[in-house]
């Protein structure tokens, strides 16, 4: 099995004016596709080629390959972006169990957003910031490069099932926001797909 670029459920301009059309098109068709091509090239003659990307992440710590770090960056890039695209949509509302858990565990939605923004802004260099479910505990964590919490703590420095994540690589925002990373981070709240986030919480 080889991985393929997932279709988006929306047009490239659907997240305007918060995420611009040109960035979305390049991000999806160029950057994500490149991660997939590299992952397929590494896995094509291995015993791991039949695994789904989620299965691959779950056993990543056990994989022994000469180019494991290259696979880590590229397979991580594939799953990170796959989660990212599905987690974006304008017009959804934070409600239900997810809203209750955020209020319960962070004190308020406003404090949760402020903490998420602060951790994202202070993440040095490229990476991702995540809201994850760690056995019923919601945590805000960051990972470097294309690491994913599903890789486990020994690989990514953290763990948990992602509820949603924000791409902090410059290619995700620089065409529109240049060096205004905080503006990009704050704009994210306008495009979070809370319906998908709630579904992931209930898994």
UniProtKB/Swiss-Prot annotation:
UniProt-listed SUPFAM superfamilies: Fe,Mn superoxide dismutase (SOD), C-terminal domain, Fe,Mn superoxide dismutase (SOD), N-terminal domain
Record-annotated residues binding Mn(2+)?
27, 81, 167, 171
Q: Name one GO cellular component term.
A: cytoplasm
The reactions it catalyses are:
2 superoxide + 2 H(+) = H2O2 + O2
Q: How is the cofactor bound?
A: Binds 1 Mn(2+) ion per subunit.
Keyword presence, Zinc: no
Task: Name the keywords, alphabetized.
Answer: Manganese, Metal-binding, Oxidoreductase
The record describes its quaternary structure and partners as: Homodimer.
What does this chain do? Destroys superoxide anion radicals which are normally produced within the cells and which are toxic to biological systems.
Question: What protein is this chain from?
Answer: Superoxide dismutase [Mn]
Q: Which organism is it from?
A: Buchnera aphidicola subsp. Schizaphis graminum (strain Sg)
């Amino acid at each position: 099995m080889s991985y393929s670029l997932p279709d988006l459920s929306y047009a490239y301009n659907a997240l305007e004016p918060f995420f611009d059309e040109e960035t979305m098109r390049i991000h999806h068709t160029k950057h994500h596709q490149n991660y997939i091509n590299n992952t397929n090239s590494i896995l094509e003659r291995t015993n791991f080629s039949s695994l789904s990307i989620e299965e691959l992440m779950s056993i990543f710590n056990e994989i022994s390959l000469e180019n494991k770090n290259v696979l880590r960056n590229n397979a991580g890039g594939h799953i990170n972006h796959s989660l990212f695209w599905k987690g974006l949509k304008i017009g959804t509302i934070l409600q239900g169990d997810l809203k209750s858990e955020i209020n319960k565990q962070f004190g308020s939605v406003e404090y949760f957003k402020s903490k998420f923004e602060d951790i994202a802004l202070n993440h040095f260099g490229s990476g991702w910031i995540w809201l994850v479910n760690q056995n019923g505990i919601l945590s805000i964590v960051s990972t470097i490069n294309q690491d994913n919490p599903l890789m486990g703590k020994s690989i990514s420095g953290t763990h948990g099932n992602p509820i949603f994540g924000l791409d902090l690589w410059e290619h995700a925002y620089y065409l529109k926001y240049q060096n205004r990373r905080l503006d990009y981070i704050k704009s994210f709240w306008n495009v979070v797909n809370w319906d998908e986030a709630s579904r992931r919480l209930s898994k």
